[in-house]
């Protein structure tokens, strides 16, 4: 029997890998260093340029805002001292408790970060550490109870504290409603994560079902039966799969292998009661748990007399291909390969234009060439 080569789209070869392995057919796939890689490189470059432009725009916007705040606010802030209710970052006159955007706590209203005269009895809460003055009411405290309760608000509270308030000398720590009532850090961000460990574990997929078989010998037996490789149980898994004794005996496993499985089950039940023991009494039950195909079907596939031994989507294999199978595909380089193949006079070409991806038709062709 000659070792023939079949051409087919790359994505179809990927889908058929398990069936090709059963038929002892070697896939020869084109390396992703040609069309796909160039396309991806171009796409990555465009994304990078877009990201850099957006980042530069953000920096420019921040610089403009910074210059505005340093150079003074509206005209009424620069002209007048003591204008009632002016929304200024700095003030040369006292004013009567005007509300500033960058403020601490002042007398009767909000004091200034850069206050030079402090208002009428205003209390400077800025980081320059100026002394505490007297408020209108004569109180020496930093804020009243209403101010403390409303510190998370974005509006000026009755006591005169805004959500942008800094920590004063009295040790008042602001809490923001946006952070779920958690303390703010020095730059105004939330100080911690509000998720619990259990919620994070669930978000990371910690509840997913994970399990294995008792021994490597049993794992080999299962692979032979259904053609699927199953891992051996290890610490941290949530399920232990046990194979029925009669199945193991019929599969050629000895008494020691069967007893070894029983011992492992006893040990796990004693050491970790959270592990679930799942019995597998039939081959169909194995297939339901792990997928795969029954042993008789595997043998039937492996003994089919196909001359195909290689399947490829590479241009360099066109000259030695016996046949070509083509179908609608996402393989970007396949169009050129198929075009080159059809120019050969002695190649057999098969085209799938019906419903589905063409996998079933490809395998049918392989089995009958």
From Swiss-Prot:
UniProt cross-references to Pfam families, sorted A to Z: Orbi_VP6
Keywords noted in UniProt: Capsid protein, Inner capsid protein, Virion
Location of this chain's protein in the cell: Virion
This protein's name: Protein VP6
Main subcellular location of this protein, as a coarse class: virion
UniProt keyword rRNA processing present: no
InterPro entries membership: Orbi_VP6
Molecular function as annotated in GO: structural molecule activity
Biased composition range(s): Basic and acidic residues: 29-68, 137-148, 196-208
GO CC, one annotated term: viral inner capsid
Homology family: Belongs to the orbivirus VP6 family.
Chain intervals with Gly residues compositional bias: 92-111
């Amino acid at each position: 029997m000659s070792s023939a080569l079949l051409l087919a789209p790359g994505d179809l070869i990927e889908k058929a890998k398990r069936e090709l392995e059963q038929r002892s057919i070697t896939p020869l796939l084109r390396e992703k260093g040609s069309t796909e890689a160039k396309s991806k490189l171009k796409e990555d470059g465009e994304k990078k340029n877009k990201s850099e432009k957006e980042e530069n725009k953000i920096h420019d916007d921040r610089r403009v805002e910074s210059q505005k705040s340093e150079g003074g606010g509206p005209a009424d802030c620069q002209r007048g001292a003591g204008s009632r209710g002016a929304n200024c970052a700095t003030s040369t006159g006292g004013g009567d408790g005007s509300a500033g955007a960058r403020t601490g706590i002042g007398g009767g209203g909000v004091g200034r970060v850069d206050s030079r005269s402090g208002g009428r009895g205003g209390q400077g809460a800025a980081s320059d550490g100026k002394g505490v003055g007297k408020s209108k009411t004569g109180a020496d405290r930093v804020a009243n109870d209403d101010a403390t309760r409303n510190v998370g608000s974005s509006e000026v509270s009755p006591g005169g504290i805004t959500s942008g308030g800094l920590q004063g000398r009295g040790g008042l720590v602001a809490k923001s409603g946006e952070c779920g009532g958690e303390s703010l850090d020095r730059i105004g961000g939330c100080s911690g994560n509000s998720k619990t460990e259990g919620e994070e574990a669930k978000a990371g997929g910690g509840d997913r079902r994970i399990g294995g078989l008792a021994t490597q010998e049993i794992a080999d037996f299962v692979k032979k039966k259904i053609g699927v490789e199953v891992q051996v149980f290890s610490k941290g898994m949530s399920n232990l799969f046990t194979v029925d004794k009669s199945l193991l005996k019929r599969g050629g496993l000895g008494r020691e292998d069967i007893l070894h499985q029983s011992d492992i089950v006893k040990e796990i039940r004693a050491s970790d009661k959270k592990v679930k023991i799942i019995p597998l009494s039939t081959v169909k039950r194995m297939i339901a748990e792990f997928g795969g195909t029954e042993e008789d079907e595997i043998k039937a596939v492996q003994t089919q007399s196909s001359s195909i031994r290689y399947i490829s989507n590479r241009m360099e294999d066109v000259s030695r291909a016996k046949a070509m199978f083509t179908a609608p595909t996402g393989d970007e380089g396949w169009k050129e390969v198929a075009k080159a193949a059809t120019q050969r006079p002695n190649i057999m070409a098969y085209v799938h234009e019906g419903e589905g991806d063409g996998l079933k038709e490809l395998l049918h062709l392989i089995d009958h060439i």
